[in-house]
């Protein structure tokens, strides 16, 4: 009865008890979303006999061993009892904000729970890093400007060798010589992320790089190669860039109207005029033909124009002697 009364005092609201705060009996643990909780409960001061161990969460002033964690595949938590060291190891993986709260590690003796150790778990949201932000906005960023990329030159035995893999969304790739008649005057700022591997001597580092250029530093693509500064750890590299460009629809909209479109308009106009003249010529030919045909018909039908009836030829008889 005494242990049950002790547990009731521990779970009682702070305003109803005098003395030290109820929070002082909990060990505070602060973790981020996605991390793993790993705590230990010791029972060295108790008799060495086989007892069950329970990990429960406080809900409505009650300790519930069957609290739910529906987002976890597999067991909700892992409890390992080391009887020789008299230590209970509790592990909870894939923490979420819903896991925040108060937990108790208890002994189960003949169906009665005895508290061993309490924990106050605070789970905070994981901060958004610069690594995943460009991937969600990369498509919108690349649609509004021209991106030039290049590789840093290497020289000397101690010069760093940098390789990069850049992620671009599908778009229109245009070489500068295809747009010789069009020269963009300005470029919109852009940002992209490159996963790079840098090695210098025996050291080898991997990291994520974010490169950003502002519109004020942009120049004409035909003025010469540009340079982009990248930084990974304590290594800074300044590299020239090549002329392969990703252009947007706004650049193509500035292009002058193509000659083929003008030729199509002229061809349509000429075709209409020719067809109209052809119809007029057919009407005129039909009129002349009809006029001649009606004139010849009237001459044939007039009785005055017919030949007079011929007289009968004289009858001549010839006798042979």
Curated annotation (Swiss-Prot):
Residues 20-121 form the Ig-like V-type domain. Detected in cultured B-cells, T-cell leukemia and monocyte leukemia. Expressed constitutively on CD8 T-cells and induced on CD4 T-cells after activation. It is found in: Cell membrane. Disulfide bonds join 41-105, 56-63. Residues 1-18 form the signal peptide. The keyword Signal applies. Keywords: Cell membrane, Disulfide bond, Glycoprotein, Immunoglobulin domain, Membrane, Receptor, Signal, Transmembrane, Transmembrane helix. Glycans are attached at residue 89. The chain crosses the membrane at residues 269-289. Residues 19-268 are extracellular. InterPro entries: Ig-like_dom (IPR007110), Ig-like_dom_sf (IPR036179), Ig-like_fold (IPR013783), Immune_rcpt_domain (IPR052314). Induction: Induced in CD4 T-cells by concanavalin-A. Residues 189-241 are annotated as: Disordered. GO terms for biological process: T cell activation. GO terms for cellular component: cell surface; plasma membrane. Residues 189-220, 227-241 have a biased composition (Polar residues). One of its GO terms (molecular function) is signaling receptor activity. It is a single-pass type I membrane protein. Residues 290-321 are cytoplasmic. Interacts with CD276 and this interaction enhances T-cell activation. Cell surface receptor that may play a role in the innate and adaptive immune response. Acts as a counter-receptor for CD276 and interaction with CD276 on T-cells enhances T-cell activation. This is Trem-like transcript 2 protein. It comes from Homo sapiens.
